[in-house]
Amino acid sequence: MNAAPGRPKQARTAARQGEGIPMNGHAPLAITLGDPAGIGPEIIAKAFRQAPDATRGAFVAGDVAAMRRASQALALPGQPAWPVARIERIAEAAAVPPGCIPVLQVVAAPAEDIVPGRISAEAGRVAGHCVVWAARAALRGEIAAIVTAPLHKEALAAAGFPYPGHTELLQAEAAAHAGLAVDGMPVRMMLANDELRTVLVSIHMSLRDAITAVSFGSVLETLRITHRALQRMLGRAPRIGVAGLNPHAGEGGLFGSEERDIIAPAIAAALAEGIDAHGPYAPDTVFMRARARPGVPGSGEFDVVIAMYHDQGLIPVKYLGVEKGVNVTLGLPLVRTSPDHGTAFDIAGTGRADASSLVEALRMARTLAGA
């Protein structure tokens, strides 16, 4: 798999102009625009307005006009829109006064080509190139972390990006930067809130393919990546619970043999490497065992649950509140977080989108990056 399509002229110009770190020595956080036909620009504007502590020193990698349209749409009756400040270099983000949204012009999103709530190749192009620009800036050390606003996978594909989502696009960029094949840089997706964390063995694929993807190697690699990442986050070895693939974790082979033949041997191999992993457990109860009491970190039986496929892991976290969830990509040589929701085309342009998950993603990114 190759890296993403080359950047347009606007992105190349922004990359040249964006070089440099602020004079305080701290690289800022970059927030990618997301799909401009979705709620990305809106929740970014709301985050700057509602959570100045989380957005402090951050900037938007995107399109100035798109952010101004979003800010204007959110203006309260009788009050001016939240100002959007165009910056020419990354280093200028720190100097933008509070009450402004700093935007580095990465790629144009013409209003006539973007319709709120409508899938289009143009919107996918804009969203994809913002992510590519941010990935390359992070890999050069120019930004401390990337916080990605939602993109639409169908629009991304229509624009010619051969990736099912952010995670795979960032993986390809990081692998290319390191001179590796994509499979030489394995990554995993973690969804987390203040009560529960889960890491997925497979990400964006059909359920049929996800079952096939459960192998000794993929489960062991997931355990290794999770152990390393959570050890850095927590400052100690994490307690890892592993969900089975089948109902009741296979019930001793009655409902499937994957637990006995694949998952349990991978856990045993991880234990031999010093990883504190346990299971496989019945998928319908392991998440409850891992759930921490609100406000009491670490009070669950496990710090994280390894889920065998996308919906098995994401449903429990999202059920606890989409507004609290944060997506973290593990295994990359950069920090990337995102809100735990999509483009919400059904409410795009209405001003109803909730920025809470984006704010939590910003706070998580700042913590992970030490920014």
What residue spans do the PLM features occupy?
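Contiguous, glycine/small-aliphatic-enriched amphipathic segments in soluble metabolic enzymes
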Residues: 2, 9-12, 16-169, 175, ...
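Small-molecule pocket liners
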Residues: 58, 167, 187-188, 196-199
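FAD-binding core/adjacent interface of flavoenzyme oxidoreductases
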Residues: 171-186
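Ligand-binding beta-strand-loop-alpha-helix segment within the catalytic cores
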Residues: 182, 190-213, 217-220
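Glycine-rich, flexible loop segments associated with nucleotide phosphate handling
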Residues: 182-190, 298-304
